[in-house]
């Protein structure tokens, strides 16, 4: 332990003398024992007084004994003070319990119990439990007095005497409870130290005695630590104990006269008997140690010191046993007592001097350690003071900077590793990049990855370090065993840039980075078939995405296989399972194993199409089992893959034809594109191939299941000047005028006549357009004109005068061409005129007759000669009703309607409806003009409206 570093972590000062009114002061007390607690130093003196010293060193006292106070102890849990003293010289000692919270009329604490000990032997020490259920007193003759009672209620207190082996004086007493016992009083173990032995007594087992050590300790050498561990300071070492015996020890040599536990420190006062100054430098050997007391707030309470004259110096050392350093060292001429309170240690000298040791704050201690470059001690100190991780990391950084400046790069990186998570990594990385310490840098970045604190840049740097060091083994270990502690994409990039394509492929496969896997296969290795095989192992979404991205490249290199995969993808895609061996990695050579080829070709797809349809149910069940029970077809939209066939038109045709055959695609783009491909002219095509393509195109157009866009298709056939397609689409769209126009533009007279005959039923005006065309044609079209006039005459499409005006535009048209037409029309007109005159005379006669009847009814009487009722056909009798229409009825047969003849009511009603309808039609202008436009003879329509009186 001689290599422990020494520091001055305490400030020492002499306590100034503060005198009371009676002249007493702390320095003038004849101190016999000390303790502390509840914010006071408690001192027993030789006059029997117990003195309480406050923080300003003011003293308040009360008379506790008539003679001297030997021992005192302040309880921690209650404000009770226990003391041992004498009222008579040479008499038995008296144990008293004081309640410091209550006072008598003299303002003195109340003594709640006074127990006179049965033995008139010097009391060396005593201890008690906090609940006062057990009080143990140690005597100089080797006897122990055990008091177990309710000191507040029991009238008689029994004292049990136990003798220790060899009748050795008792030098220390203490309790520590066992963990298995719930009650401290029931399960407490009494720890007894004599000058020759260390003994335990199990109070729960009839004070069963167990000797746990054959070496004891002197007065003042025993104490209990804050955690309840017994400590014995011997000349060879400091020993810790537990219930079973010795625990750890610290080899501090030298005689220890007094010990104290202060916070986490062990305070030792003593001297070195061998004058080696190992533990107590500067101590002078001399005199003989007498049995002295130690007033302590922990552990046993020792007997009063009997100071003998000596010339040796006492040396005080304060040890931090956890962090292993000496926090303070100081010499004193004499030391009679030591205790602590208010965060300070108080040293009482026999000469009346009192010294106060106050611990420096942690920051000051750390600064001191930094100046002395004791960084490891600083780290331990910061941890023991429960500094946060950030503050501790600052200490590690300081330590690392110190080692780095000294050139100890390995040691520096060890300290920097402890700052991970607190210190910015770039601070460390920059240092070792500048110094070209790649090995150290690699260690640091590895640690960043292990703690999941690495960024993509860190991964890049680490892999670059591996590649720069050509440390393939570490590179392989990193990518093989690391579980999510690095950025995968960055690792793939670095391996790819460094030419480690097999490692990059492994990472991409292991972490399902499909895009990177395919990019390496296609762009770096040109393994097109393997790439396509890999795509087929992916689920539908990934396969769809990657074929859209890399399909163009794959179609250019392996068109048949790629087209086959696309056919599957767009119909009923199911991933294949033949690529599992892809991730197998040979660590010696690190090569990707050969996988089974699973590429689908167009031939395979088309040949198996019918079989798949026939066995759809069985396949569906199998597919469900192989694909996580997916109960629906996964298929892509074929129109989204058209662009990848930009340089492979023939394979695009096959792909689209297959999609059309499936008949389950609603996109018109598929059909439009296929039609365009059929019509495209290719210089490499033979005439037979062109004819076959046009035949396919016509079959495609006429197929009722085709879902092409008609307008788009019309543009295509027009652009490619495909007559059959143009005429078919015109007909399908009922664009009859465009059909006529097409024949006119191509001077196809026969086609024009045929079109008029075919579509003239639906649109008679086609003949009129044909007549206009032939009339303006410079060629001889007399036969065609005759044909047209025949059909115009048959349908009576236009007046003869208009026909003559149209034909007059062609100078080549002779009268012979229209001779038959004019003769026929004049004959028809003459017949129609005669017919109209006959009808006019008939209407005039009927009108005159009606006027005569009206006049007769107005001017002459009407004779009713009916003898039978029209309703019941019985003879008329009174009362009866006669109408001007010559119908007669019984009044009883008419009922309530006597104003209108029932027999004529229907005809009258129809006439009224006609008149009402004509009146309504007078306001329906749109209907009139619509009828006028659709009528072959507008004049007839207007005349008819005039005849009805609608226009009146």
UniProtKB/Swiss-Prot annotation:
Stretches annotated zinc finger (RING-type): 869-905
Keyword terms of this UniProt record: Coiled coil, Membrane, Metal-binding, Protein transport, Repeat, Transport, Vacuole, Zinc, Zinc-finger
Coiled-coil intervals: 837-868
CHCR repeat copies, ranges: 416-563, 629-783
Biological process (GO), any one: organelle fusion
CDD domains xref list: RING-H2_Vps11
Organism of provenance: Dictyostelium discoideum (Social amoeba)
Main location: membrane
The name this protein goes by in its record: Vacuolar protein sorting-associated protein 11 homolog
